[in-house]
Amino acid sequence: MAALRRLLWPPPRLSPTLAPQQPFLSPWGRPAGTAPGMSGRPFSGREEDEGAVAEAAWRRRRWGELSIAAAAGGGLVGLVCYQLYGDPRADPSELVAPELDESPRGRGLLPIPVAAAKETVATGRAVTEDLDLYATSRERRFRLFASIECEGQLFMTPYDFILAVTTDEPKFAKTWKSLSKQELSQMLSETPPVWKGSSKLFRNLKERGVISYTEYLFLLCILTKPHAGFRIAFNMFDTDGNEMVDKKEFLVLQEIFRKKNEKRETKGDEEKRAMLRLQLYGYHSPTNSVLKPDAEELVSRSYWDTLRRSTSQALFSDLAERADDITSLVADTTLLVHFFGKKGKAELNFEDFYRFMDNLQTEVLEIEFLSYSNGMNTISEEDFAHILLRYTNVENTSVFLENVRYSIPEEKGITFDEFRSFFQFLNNLEDFAIALNMYNFASRSIGQDEFKRAVYVATGLKLSPHLVNTVFKIFDVDKDDQLSYKEFIGIMKDRLHRGFRGYKTVQKYPTFKSCLKKELHSR
């Protein structure tokens, strides 16, 4: 305000009572009543007119400076607002790019590339928003992240799937981009064959592909299963035992997952539930299901257990008679083209199937690691704790994070190899729990050496001493350097089911942007 006052107020005139030897200094730092550049001598007559002209020019120059400053300030405010709220037309695929835009030096890891899907007619969600009332939590999550609609059926892109398993929720509501059959076929033509797969498949495809709801559930199963379970999954699809799986055999999971959802449907408006089934499966439920009614209707099972228990029943039912009907009803997807070729005639062997499942697990872990590594080859022990606690039901994570800060004051870092080995161990958590219960039989906890030994016996994995020490520092709440079932297994079971349970919103570190946004909303 003082600067503005100096700019706007005219310079005071020289008082006649002041002697020339003691001039009165004006706000501009020169004797009042003198023109700029003059020696401080009072003026009168013509000199006074010239001084007035000079002072007017001086004021005009000051007004110009003020205008420039105001324009610069306005530009700065506009930039801050743009950074806060973004372009309202921004593509949803760009929303999480800042979190995943770095890759560690010296590694082959890549973040999710940001690429917009082909622009088509956008379909608003308002018309079908009330369908969430009839959907399960998994169905709602799929609909939340799906961005493609073709003939009434919703699909995720490979990019959508990565976001669904690595972020808590979309930062902005998406619109479903409507594709015709021809556009979908053109998109799928870019799908590589299975023998060209890699741990960057989903990031390379970006938004040039589609994943159905049943495939989404199947991929979530893969993410939480040990490598030993890959053979079980393959054998479940191999109906004739020839060590090969064809497209018709693979499509049995479509019927299995659909039937499981029918049991859990919310009673209500039949028209709305039919519309929801059309969105998720692309067709209405057939009158004669491939699967027979389950006698244990009230027993809640995971999708993996349902797949394992129901496949044998489906394989010896009327599937062979209806296989062609099911194939004609199911739209081609990226996964089907990747496994069985563009014509659907190729067959999938176990080696390619195993490689695909292993690559998917690796890709998701790479993306999670990169979101915290900031271009480095390691993440901090505290960031490792953040990732472990991310999808758990722990209400107060600050206790665990404080344990890490206090117990490991000097950061050493967790490498990607250590990071990956730990999550491979988590996928074997059930076997490890059996071993841990043996130690815990007499209500005793275990130390680090016993923990490493139990992990190796149950999973065959050797965890590094630093990784084991970090895990103990995170979960050893009572600081006795011992680990119990309650301190570890109970929490990690929540983490293991990352895709099947509700996502816990994680508090992010406060930033200038969040503080400023909060202040603007409060006014």
Swiss-Prot record:
Residues binding Ca(2+) 1 are D238, D240, N242, M244, D246, E249
| SMART domains listed in its UniProt record | EFh
Gene Ontology molecular function: calcium channel regulator activity; calcium ion binding; calcium ion sensor activity; protein heterodimerization activity
List localization entries.
Mitochondrion intermembrane space; Mitochondrion inner membrane
Q: Where does Ca(2+) 2 bind?
A: D476, D478, D480, Q482, E487
Question: Which residues constitute the organelle targeting sequence?
Answer: 1-6
Q: What is its main location?
A: mitochondrion
What the entry lists under InterPro entries is as follows: EF-hand-dom_pair (IPR011992), EF_Hand_1_Ca_BS (IPR018247), EF_hand_dom (IPR002048), MICU1/2/3 (IPR039800)
Q: Which residues does UniProt assign to the signal peptide?
A: none
Question: Residues in domain EF-hand?
Answer: 225-260, 414-429, 463-498
Which parts of the sequence are annotated with region: Disordered?
18-48
Q: Which CDD domains match?
A: EFh_MICU3
A GO cellular component annotation here is:
mitochondrion
Q: Name one GO biological process term.
A: calcium import into the mitochondrion
Q: What is known of its domains?
A: EF-hand domains 1 and 3 have high affinity for calcium and act as sensors of mitochondrial matrix calcium levels. EF-hand domain 2 is degenerate.
Function per UniProt:
Tissue-specific calcium sensor of the mitochondrial calcium uniporter (MCU) channel, which specifically regulates MCU channel activity in the central nervous system and skeletal muscle. Senses calcium level via its EF-hand domains: compared to MICU1 and MICU2, MICU3 has a higher affinity for calcium. MICU1 and MICU3 form a disulfide-linked heterodimer that stimulates and inhibits MCU activity, depending on the concentration of calcium. At low calcium levels, MICU1 occludes the pore of the MCU channel, preventing mitochondrial calcium uptake.
What is its quaternary makeup? Heterodimer; disulfide-linked; heterodimerizes with MICU1. Component of the uniplex complex, composed of MCU, EMRE/SMDT1, MICU1 and MICU3 in a 4:4:1:1 stoichiometry.
Q: Would you tell me the protein name for this molecule?
A: Calcium uptake protein 3, mitochondrial
Species assigned in the record: Rattus norvegicus
